[in-house]
Curated annotation (Swiss-Prot):
Molecular function GO terms recorded: aminoacyl-tRNA deacylase activity; ATP binding; leucine-tRNA ligase activity
Organism (species): Desulfotalea psychrophila (strain LSv54 / DSM 12343)
Chief location: cytoplasm
Catalytic activity: tRNA(Leu) + L-leucine + ATP = L-leucyl-tRNA(Leu) + AMP + diphosphate
UniProt short sequence motif 'HIGH' region, positions renumbered to this chain: 46-56
Residue numbers covered by motif 'KMSKS' region: 585-589
Entry GO CC: cytosol
Protein name (record): Leucine--tRNA ligase
Encoding gene (name): leuS
Superkingdom classification of source: Bacteria
PANTHER family assigned: LEUCINE--TRNA LIGASE, MITOCHONDRIAL (PTHR43740:SF2), LEUCYL-TRNA SYNTHETASE (PTHR43740)
Amino acid sequence: MQHPTNARYDFKTIESKWQKNWAENKTYSVTEDEDKEKYYLLEMFPYPSGRIHMGHVRNYTIGDVVARYKRMRGFNVLHPMGWDAFGLPAENAAQKNNTHPSVWTYDNIDYMRQQLQQLGLSYDWDREMATCNPKYYRQEQQLFIEMLEKGLIYEKVTTVNWCDTCQTVLANEQVIEGACWRCDQLVHPRKMNGWFFKITDYAEELLADLDKLTGWPEKVRTMQRNWIGKSTGLSCDFQLEDMDDKISIFTTRPDTIYGVTFMSLAPEHPLVEQLIAGTDREQEVRDFVKEVLEDKQRQDPTQEPEKKGIFTGKYCTNPFNGDRVPVYVANFVLIEYGTGAVMAVPAHDQRDFEFAGKYKLPIIPVVVPEGEAVNPADMEEALTNHGLLINSGDFTGMASQEAQAKIIAYAEEKGFGSPLTTYRLRDWGISRQRYWGAPIPIIHCDSCGIVPVPIDQLPVELPEDKDKSSVCAPLHQRPDFINTTCPKCGQPAKRETDTMDTFVESSWYFARYTSPRHTEAPLDKAKAKYWLAVDQYIGGVEHAILHLLYSRFFTKVLRDLGYLEIDEPFIKLLTQGMVIKDGTKMSKSKGNVVDPHDLISEFGADTTRLFSLFAAPPERDLEWSSEGVEGSSRFLNRIYRFITANFEALTAGEAFPKKLSEEDRLLHRKNHQTIKRVTENIEHNFHFNTAISAVMELVNQLFAQFKNEKSIAAPAVLRASVDSVLLLLSPMVPHFCNEMWMVLGNTEPIENQAWPEFDIEATKEDLLTIIIQVRGKVRSKIQVPVDIEEDEIVALALADENCQKFIDGQPIKKTIVVKKKLVNIVI
């Protein structure tokens, strides 16, 4: 125990000291302990781009505070970190810098790990993983094979972006305004084989289990419900004229089916080619389809394109009324949704209404508001609400909801339709024609067909390039990788050259953290059972659908493969706000980026952490403020000065007084009120900003104990409050609090201490503030004892000098007392 003599807190020396201590002692390494309640805290792992940004600082600091708090509450805390390391940016950087993606990636990981350690984050670095490591994706390849054997993976032809100049497939991210990012030549769609995960097999469970996720923001659950998009309605076939084929449609509004006046097909619909083959419209329709597909590449996905279509020259028949219905190809029909064919009812669908107006197609109202007549010529927009049916055969006069059920039953009875439940969700296409991804463990044999790579031959590794000219060349351009032997028949065969979507790696990494060095299987079942599910997951709302939905899917698959016993991966989810400056998100293009490295160098990690926690609640955006950072630094130095100025009193070792003076009682009460407020703010909603504010009030109270530079509170009462300040702030500013804790003579680091408990009796105030109203208007306030009777409060209120002015001798009709809050005097 040594009296600190520096005028200011030396953050550089102290932070380096404690970071070294934590690393050498593996302070935050953890193993399973059946005698302790586990708590698994996880933030979404980062892509190793090269440097952390303020969004990382905020996200990871929030998680670190929770992890440190839970440790002090006695939990066995798992708090791991790793790297989502595959992806397109590494390929781009490797080509730009004439290096290999693995070199670029691991260099970035080394630098970013150092940055995270400089923030004082309490990670179990023994569990660190990079998804580009063959030891990681070897287990992923085994999962692929097990899913294939269970019927959860299949191969089919799909449409991709193709560049003729580069002779390669491009990811959507590589297509810029319809052109190849590399050669700037026009990209066009091409059909190719691709691998798919059957996520639709789990659509109903994924939807139903959202109701279990009560610890998730409702916004995220709603987004997933909408993405899964369950619909119930009618599946119905429209027979094509002069052809054996039928057009199958699905509609959620069977009550409008008598109003069909044309049929719309997606440009990619397989029937389009059959409809136009050998007709005088063949070339015109093909040109239109080509134009629409190219326009799709260029268009802004947030903008609604102009509706365009072309008549195929063919007709189909409405099975309900026998109407002859022209068949169009339309740019607003998507092959991914429904059947890729839409029965068009312009009177009751706005897109169809606009299309019909443009191409002079009939508009036939069949559902109208009760008691109203509708003239199609007078319609300015589609009638989309339910109502009563007209022009609908035997169903005329029925209400929409009643008619829907009867129309479906009629179609089923007649054999041209049936009830159907559909989902907007589509199977997950995981094939990527990139180099920097996990190879798909499949061999193609002319004799045996599709053959999984034997488990004992995993991993299928990416080829390493000695020739830098071939860095990142797609696998289909590498004969040394492609050519192999069939494990079944021993004949020459070829490897699959697609790699997996990088979302695959991030869909199960949280489970792998429970046994990251396990080599016998993707997961150690016993360890997974102990740690999972994740108790608290933290990340941006931009991942609400894809990553979070895929992780839920993988959890259910891992359960069905026998690895897990849980249904959902994340019990609670916090989607933190962005860090913004000048009203917009920080970005290089806007020139408003604040580099955490510079901030830590100037102010230290603890100040950086404190600002990121104090400036806003975690779920809201944080507005950058230089003044806020400086204020956080001043606050820590204020505590430091208090401890150094009162070092002798704080380390005197006096016993806590049996009888408290008035000053002691005030400080003691404030101390326990602060413990209560901070505990509740962290425990209930992670509102660290109000928790820090409460500690600031306690620090102010500490300074208020001094008159003429001498404490009027007993040293032991003073020390108890200072201990609370350090304990309560330690999850937020761990270096500073550890150092001050040891300076005050403690022998064990602060993270080994229990979280302070509050005495509920000690938090209670002696006096209440009662508001006095006269005729409902506030006229005065009085202080009264907590245990005062109501009639005594009324007497004091009536005697109050300010109230007397407003009563002015008038007779009092009655008094109304709201317990412990106010008295209203009615005159």
